[in-house]
């Protein structure tokens, strides 16, 4: 891995703890519209930040952490087991398979798949239903707080564990091999070191 790239990585907060917690604790409802590919943290950020996730028919997700020799971040290890169950979460995190939009809805990781041309308008309309005068903003904020606040300590701990793992893995031969293999467009040959 290039030294100038490694110099940009803050080893103290690779999992983006502060960012993830800030998004998760946002009082106002947040809606996400995914209109194409969402790889790794791009999707897990939506899990942390969004109250509702809507997908274009063209959207898909890949969680390539293990294929790169790194650990999941942005709370992936916190959210996925709670949303999917432990074994399904492990399957998604261990194997970098492409997950199409309909499968994401079936798994409970998104709310709906929409025609690409209708995605943003639908998401906007749903957002308008959550704010005054159509939505009871105080009620929604109170319910969101009641659902999220008990989880903050656990999420914080999971992010600490992700940071610890990422700090070690970024110095590993497997990480270097994962990145090199991706750049060279070949399958990685991990050594476990």
Which positions does each model-derived feature cover?
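Short, well-ordered beta-strand elements within core beta-sheets of diverse protein domains
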Residues: 31, 94, 110-114, 167-171
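Acidic, divalent-metal-coordinating active-site segment for phosphoryl/phosphodiester hydrolysis
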Residues: 96-103
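Glycine- (often His-adjacent) and acidic-residue-rich active-site loop
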Residues: 1-22, 38, 67-69, 150
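Structural motif
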Residues: 48-49, 107-108, 185
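C-terminal long alpha-helix characteristic of the crotonase
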Residues: 54-59, 110-160, 173, 187-193
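A general structural signal for well-ordered alpha-helical segments in protein cores
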Residues: 16, 77, 86-89, 120, ...
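CoA-thioester-processing core
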Residues: 19-25, 33, 39-93, 122-127
């Amino acid at each position: 891995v290039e030294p100038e790239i490694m110099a940009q990585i803050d080893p103290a907060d690779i999992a983006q703890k502060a960012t993830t917690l800030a998004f998760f604790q946002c009082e106002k409802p947040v809606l996400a519209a995914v209109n194409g590919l969402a790889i790794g943290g791009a999707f897990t950020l939506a899990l942390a930040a969004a109250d509702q996730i809507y997908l274009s028919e063209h959207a898909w997700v890949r969680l390539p952490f293990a294929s790169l020799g790194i650990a999941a971040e942005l709370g992936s290890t916190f959210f996925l087991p709670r949303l999917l169950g432990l074994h399904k979460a492990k399957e998604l995190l261990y194997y970098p398979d492409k997950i199409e939009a309909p499968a994401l809805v079936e798994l409970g990781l998104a709310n709906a798949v929409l025609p690409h041309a209708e995605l943003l308008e639908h998401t906007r309309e749903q957002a308008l239903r959550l704010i005054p005068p159509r939505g009871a903003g105080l009620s929604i904020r109170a319910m969101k707080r009641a659902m999220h606040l008990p989880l903050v300590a656990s999420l914080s701990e999971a992010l600490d564990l992700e940071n610890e793992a990422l700090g070690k893995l970024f110095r590993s031969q497997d990480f270097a091999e994962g990145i090199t293999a991706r750049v060279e467009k070949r399958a990685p040959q991990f050594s476990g070191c």
